[in-house]
């Protein structure tokens, strides 16, 4: 019961904090421009008794407002993406059908409680609220539509070559949204939706930081850090000059307090740079040293006959074949077909797809990484950063294009896979024919290269053959001349 108010509070704070940040920026602009640059450096007030320093004041203003411009641009781009393109996955109809009766029952219980002074006992609250493990699709007391009845929605996954799966080979399932989740997708409690490559819910930027906004979040952190460091250095320099003037200590202290508060905030936010260098999200980083990823990796066509039952070659891995066969009929007591005239039953299973034996089959090997391995790490921090920030300097500095990792059009996998997946394929013998042919060609070239020391022997054999031909030709000439003389 406490989750709903907390969610509303977090959303309300996420809408208020951006306004507060803009207020802090406006106040810092006033402090740097009027009291420091104009009244102290460019046109000093009589009480300072100091000469005019127009160059220093102008330089500070130029650097300050250039950095401020980048801060505002990146922040506006970030806010727009977080609000209008957070990359949320749509909820399934089954989830909406489950949530509607639950909301009605909660509203009725509230009205009864307010009207008659009845308060729910603790046991009632526990029985009404399902005990769930959202990430593992375990949702007890969640109703008959917690798991799918057919293979609807699985085609998106088994058309890829690699995807993250459960131990049984099916994709990760969200029991709250009632659908399968693409790789690195997590359910956000604040928005009650699944988010692609969710990093964290950040009230400072107004919502969820995900794959569509993580790049702009890093750029905003970077320019804000430069901006705050500039303000901090300027304030430190001129505070040292004004240290003996008691009337100016309070103003300089205010500037230092603001700068230090913002810097302390940025220290926590700058961790995202480290996460991007390791190609991790904040959620994945929680157990990155012990996490074990289960992957479904496509078995190449030339190996399918070898893993069939009755063959001599015994695979060292479990497999799963898509499309999945029809599920067994539901348990007794669970409605399966709507009654005549009652319309659609929200608890009836969808129609079971037809299983044509001639239909194309997709066989996947179920493999697991070692603890602490990251299948999405590309082998170097630069390659990992390029997946978030882009492949050019302009992409790194300007918040224009989206991250390359937000493009999921590849037929290989949802995200670019690293050396860990290549090693798993090699250990399981799942390399494709092209890769095997490439390795054979490489070996052939290497063997030719390694056999180069025997080249002199080849030359000697060629010389022998040449001498043999010359000797045969000379003998034939002598024989013909002798015959002519005779």
From Swiss-Prot:
Membrane topology term: Multi-pass membrane protein
Domain (DHHC) ranges: 172-222
Enzyme Commission identifier(s): 2.3.1.225
Pfam families associated with the record: DHHC
Keyword Membrane appears in the UniProt entry: yes
Transmembrane segments: 12-32, 54-74, 217-237, 261-281
PROSITE patterns: DHHC
Recorded GO CC terms: endoplasmic reticulum; Golgi apparatus; membrane
Family: Belongs to the DHHC palmitoyltransferase family. PFA5 subfamily.
UniProt protein name: Palmitoyltransferase pfa5
């Amino acid at each position: 019961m406490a989750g709903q108010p907390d969610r509303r509070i977090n959303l309300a704070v996420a809408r208020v904090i951006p306004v507060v940040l803009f207020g802090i920026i406006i106040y810092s602009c006033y402090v740097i421009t009027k009291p420091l640059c104009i009244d102290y450096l460019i046109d000093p007030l009589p009480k300072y008794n100091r000469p005019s320093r127009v160059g220093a004041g102008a330089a500070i203003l130029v650097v300050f407002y250039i950095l401020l411009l980048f801060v505002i641009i990146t922040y506006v781009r970030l806010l727009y993406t977080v609000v209008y393109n957070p990359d949320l996955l749509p909820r399934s109809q089954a989830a909406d059908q489950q949530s509607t009766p639950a909301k009605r029952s909660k509203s009725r219980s509230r009205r009864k409680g307010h009207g008659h002074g009845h308060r729910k006992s603790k046991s009632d609250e526990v029985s009404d609220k399902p005990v769930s493990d959202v990430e593992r699709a375990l949702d007890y007391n969640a109703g008959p539509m917690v798991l799918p009845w057919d293979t609807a929605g699985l085609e998106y996954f088994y058309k890829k070559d690699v995807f993250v799966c459960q131990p049984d080979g099916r994709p990760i399932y969200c029991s709250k949204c009632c659908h399968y989740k693409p790789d690195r997708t997590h359910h956000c409690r604040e928005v009650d939706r699944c988010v692609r490559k969710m990093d964290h819910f950040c009230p400072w930027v107004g919502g969820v930081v995900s794959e569509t906004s993580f790049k702009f979040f890093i750029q905003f952190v970077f320019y804000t850090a430069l901006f705050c460091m500039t303000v901090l250095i300027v304030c430190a320099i001129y505070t040292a000059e004004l240290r003996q003037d008691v009337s100016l200590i309070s103003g300089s202290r205010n500037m230092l307090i603001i700068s230090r508060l913002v810097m302390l905030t940025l220290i926590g936010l700058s961790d995202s740079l480290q996460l991007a260098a390791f190609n991790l999200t904040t959620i994945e980083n929680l157990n990155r040293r012990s996490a074990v990823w289960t992957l479904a990796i496509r078995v190449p066509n030339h190996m399918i006959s070898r893993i069939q039952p009755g063959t001599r070659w015994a695979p060292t891995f479990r497999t799963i074949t898509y499309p999945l066969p029809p599920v067994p009929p539901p348990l007794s007591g669970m409605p399966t077909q709507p009654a005549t005239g009652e319309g659609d039953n929200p608890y009836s299973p969808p129609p079971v797809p037809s299983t044509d034996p001639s239909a194309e089959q997709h066989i996947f090997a179920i493999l697991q990484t070692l603890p602490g391995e990251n299948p999405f790490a590309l082998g170097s921090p630069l390659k990992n950063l390029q997946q978030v920030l882009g492949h050019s300097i302009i992409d790194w500095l300007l918040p224009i294009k989206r991250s390359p990792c937000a493009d999921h059009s590849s037929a290989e996998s949802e995200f670019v896979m690293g050396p860990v997946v290549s090693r798993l394929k090699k250990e399981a013998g799942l390399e494709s024919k092209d890769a095997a042919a490439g390795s054979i060609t490489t070996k052939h070239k290497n063997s030719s290269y390694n056999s180069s020391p025997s080249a002199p022997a080849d030359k000697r054999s060629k010389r022998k053959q040449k001498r043999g031909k010359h000797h045969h030709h000379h003998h034939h000439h002598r024989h013909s001349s002798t015959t002519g003389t005779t």
